Amino acid sequence: MAGKRRKKGRSHSTRPATPTVPKWIQYDPEEIEEIIVDLARKGYGPSMIGIILRDQFGIPLVKPILGKSITEVLEERGIKMVVPEDLFRLIEKAVNLRRHLEEHPKDTHAKKGLLDLESKIRRLAEYYKRVGKLPRDWKYDPQQAKLLVAGGLYREEKPAS
């Protein structure tokens, strides 16, 4: 009998069982790092960068090759995420939903969706404050969220030398 969450076929890729460096990779670690930085500068998030590396460059996982994650590579190069990517995507969704509600104020389902979404944002923010990925005084504010989303996922700083 199938599990509760997965009914019928759900398409997904399987991660390699043992994360080793595949023989078919034609790129050396420096080239892979350059590709990652270029994609980040184009505005792609770490998850999308991973998908592009897998689908277009034939690189299944970055960590076995470089010994560090995509986010760590970007931070070494001075490209830092404003907030963690999953939180940023939720905030982006909330901003778009608020814009929708300005045009359609009677959409009660969207209002409920916004309440649920903002609750999820606050819960996730609490977690990130607890583990130290967000400052203790960080607070979700819908007006600030618009500015955060408009500014993008990354801030470029001077690389640590």
Swiss-Prot record:
<feature type="region of interest" description="Disordered">
    <location>
        <begin position="1"/>
        <end position="22"/>
    </location>
</feature>
<dbReference type="Pfam" id="PF00312">
    <property type="entry name" value="Ribosomal_S15"/>
</dbReference>
<dbReference type="InterPro" id="IPR009068">
    <property type="entry name" value="uS15_NS1_RNA-bd_sf"/>
</dbReference>
<dbReference type="InterPro" id="IPR000589">
    <property type="entry name" value="Ribosomal_uS15"/>
</dbReference>
<dbReference type="GO" id="GO:0006412">
    <property type="term" value="P:translation"/>
</dbReference>
<dbReference type="InterPro" id="IPR023029">
    <property type="entry name" value="Ribosomal_uS15_arc_euk"/>
</dbReference>
<dbReference type="GO" id="GO:0022627">
    <property type="term" value="C:cytosolic small ribosomal subunit"/>
</dbReference>
<dbReference type="Pfam" id="PF08069">
    <property type="entry name" value="Ribosomal_S13_N"/>
</dbReference>
<feature type="compositionally biased region" description="Basic residues">
    <location>
        <begin position="1"/>
        <end position="13"/>
    </location>
</feature>
<dbReference type="InterPro" id="IPR012606">
    <property type="entry name" value="Ribosomal_uS15_N"/>
</dbReference>
<keyword id="KW-0689">Ribosomal protein</keyword>
<dbReference type="GO" id="GO:0003735">
    <property type="term" value="F:structural constituent of ribosome"/>
</dbReference>
<protein>
    <recommendedName>
        <fullName>Small ribosomal subunit protein uS15</fullName>
    </recommendedName>
</protein>
<comment type="subunit">
    <text>Part of the 30S ribosomal subunit.</text>
</comment>
<keyword id="KW-0687">Ribonucleoprotein</keyword>
<dbReference type="GO" id="GO:0070181">
    <property type="term" value="F:small ribosomal subunit rRNA binding"/>
</dbReference>
<comment type="similarity">
    <text>Belongs to the universal ribosomal protein uS15 family.</text>
</comment>
